[in-house]
Amino acid sequence: MNREEMHCDVVKI
């Protein structure tokens, strides 16, 4: 899991 992927999750919510 990359930091950008986590960012995507945060933006998704």
Curated annotation (Swiss-Prot):
It comes from the Bacteria. It holds the Pfam family PssL. InterPro entries: PssL-like. Coiled coil: none annotated. Induction: A fusion of the 5' UTR and initial codons of the gene with lacZ allows expression of beta-galactosidase, suggesting this protein is expressed (at protein level). May serve a regulatory role in expression of downstream gene pssA; in a pssL-pssA-lacZ fusion, mutation of the start codon of pssA to a stop codon in pssL decreases expression of beta-galactosidase, suggesting translation of the 2 genes is coupled. This gene lies upstream of and overlaps pssA on the same strand in another reading frame. This is Protein PssL. It comes from Escherichia coli (strain K12). The gene is pssL.
